[in-house]
Amino acid sequence: MTLVAWLVLVEGGTAFWYRSQESRLPRAASWSVELPRDNATFRESPLSEAAKGLLRPDEVISASWTETGNLQWRVIYLRWNPGRVAGYLAALHTPQLCMPGAGFTLKASSPVKLFASQGVQLPFRGYTFEKDGFPIHVFYCRWEDRPHKEISVGEDPSRLALLRSVWTGRITGGQRVLEVAIRGSADQQEAEGALARELDKIIISNTEKPKH
């Protein structure tokens, strides 16, 4: 067998493997965000070219604004189209990796908690960081468009996680990351309440309906 024929065989077998695994996964759920651009304090906050080059998202929404009561918001929404490394790229953006690089110190983290919004159950993990004596509460959700049994939020971007995702066919599916940072909340509980209210305003759901 020639080298070219061997490469074609390997590539074909790989593609068949991905398709066979994906066909067993649940039907997709689709959602996006719509931020309050009519807020007078709304400001776009583009990712740096270095960050975009590393993460390579297909869609980026990043902005900040201030609400009545002086709650300051920063939201980053990233989306990756289906592809062989979508899951790995999505896992590269987490608060544990990004916030310390901006001078923030991690003070506490909380287990995954589901927040219901527009008919979608979004799994968020909460973090409390501090910089210059001021706390900031960060909530992180990583969403697989065709999720497996386990919740993916907070998975580490290690080779083991990559291989696990490949084995179940999950890594080829579309991926989304939603990170919400809140400054001005008295504590984690107050920040969670503010997050729940804000999600109802900014989440847009377009979940696929089963075909009959």
Locate predicted features.
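Hydrophobic membrane-insertion alpha-helices, especially the h-region
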Residues: 1-15
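Alpha-helical transmembrane signal-anchor/signal-peptide segments
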Residues: 17-38
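Generic structural signal for short, solvent-exposed loop/turn connectors between secondary structure elements
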Residues: 34-47, 183-188
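A generic structural signal for short, non-catalytic loop/turn and secondary-structure boundary residues
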Residues: 35-37, 68, 171-173
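Short, solvent-exposed recognition patches
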Residues: 41-169
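Surface-exposed amphipathic alpha-helical segments
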Residues: 174-212
